[in-house]
Amino acid sequence: MIKNISNLGDAALYCDFGSEVNKEINSKVIRYFKSIQKENIDGINNLTPSYNKLIISFDLRKKNFQTIKKLIENLNITNDDELETNRIKIPVCCDENFSLDIKRLEEKLQITRDKIYEKFFGKEFFCYMTGFIAGMPFLGDLENELQAKRLETPRVKVPKGSVGLTEQFANVYTFESPG
């Protein structure tokens, strides 16, 4: 299930599940993450899951790379393990102050903002991870036609509560920040 396990500095391990971003790979990452948490392995300090990677930080005084690697490889993880999920409704305001890219999207897609909103709100998203800023969800599987490239020059300030469309993700800004 893990394609490669390598060093990440002297006290961390990098588990690579593949380069694609999809639910199947992300589910594998989460299964390993939850299983390692459940095992409560002495010497593991921190687990950091992402779309398709898992970073495991460890205490060199208790465990080394080879020991942790062997423990990870010997975990009995199956796709049968049910993943607990939650549905969360996120209120979104489409006011001009929060829809910073709507005009750019209208031009790119050659459709009205109402049609953009209809496509966006007509979908249920999957949260691949949170990060960049505290609690910011990376909501994936955005329709191809709604995908937008990153801005060449990021904004200095994006208001809290704004929704950004970047590549295949929709992100909700949990704090005012650059973006």
Residue ranges and their predicted role:
Residues 1-179:
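Glycine-rich active-site loops that engage anionic ligands at enzyme catalytic sites
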